[in-house]
Amino acid sequence: MSDTADRVQKIVVEHLGVEADKVNQEASFIDDLGADSLDIVELVMAFEEEFGVEIPDDAAEKISTVGDATKYIEEHKG
């Protein structure tokens, strides 16, 4: 796993209180990890802070899996 993927996983575990082994790149925040819309907003804000990226609302709406978040961050971080 890349450094970005490791950091994304850590944030997801901390914010959603799920086991690390459930957080893989294919895991859906809502369907697999039990997140709700507020959790998603908090995760996006945590990703923005951790990685120094801005994730606009239209992009955030397309991020539904851990892999989506990792890919977006890797493509947009400085």
Curated annotation (Swiss-Prot):
InterPro entries: ACP (IPR003231), ACP-like_sf (IPR036736), PP-bd_ACP (IPR009081), Ppantetheine_attach_site (IPR006162). GO terms for biological process: lipid A biosynthetic process. Residues 2-77 form the Carrier domain. Pfam families: PP-binding (PF00550). Pathway: Lipid metabolism; fatty acid biosynthesis. GO terms for cellular component: cytosol; membrane. The modification O-(pantetheine 4'-phosphoryl)serine is found at S37. GO terms for molecular function: acyl binding; acyl carrier activity. Keywords: Cytoplasm, Fatty acid biosynthesis, Fatty acid metabolism, Lipid biosynthesis, Lipid metabolism, Phosphopantetheine, Phosphoprotein. It is found in: Cytoplasm. 4'-phosphopantetheine is transferred from CoA to a specific serine of apo-ACP by AcpS. This modification is essential for activity because fatty acids are bound in thioester linkage to the sulfhydryl of the prosthetic group. Carrier of the growing fatty acid chain in fatty acid biosynthesis. Belongs to the acyl carrier protein (ACP) family. This is Acyl carrier protein. It comes from Erythrobacter litoralis (strain HTCC2594). The gene is acpP.
